[in-house]
C-alpha cells in the first residue's frame, strides 16, 4: 500500500471484495446448518444481497478506473473459520442457531466497520458515486445485523438457554 488515502481506500475496497466473495461461500453452509426456518431464510436472503454487494464493489472499481480484484481478507477468514468450528459442535438445535447468529453478527459487525470507513473515505475524497454505492451496502449490512438481533432476542437465545437447563431424558 502506498502512502496516499486513495491507495488505502483501494486496498480496503479489495479487502471488502474478497470478504464478500468468502461470505458467498460461507452463507449457504450457515443456512444449511440453521434449524430455525426464519434464521435459514435470513441467511439465504443475505446471500442474495451479498451477490449485490460484490456487483456494487465492481461498480466502484470501474467508476475509479481501478482493476477489479480482491486482496485476501484475513479478518473475515478468521470469523468464517470460527463459524465453521461452531457448525462442527455437537449441540442442540437451539444452541446451534444461537451460535450461528453470533457468528453471523461477528461477520456483519466486521463489514459494518469496513463499509463505514469506505463510505467516509469516498466522501472525503469526493467520490460521490462510490460513496453512494458503498452506503447502500452499509445500510444492508446494518439491516442484516438488526434482523439477526431480532431473531436472537425474539426467541432463539431463550430457547437455547431453556435447553441448557432442561433435564436430560433417556431415549
Regions found by a protein language model. Give the residues of each.
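Amphipathic alpha-helical hairpins
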Residues: 1-171
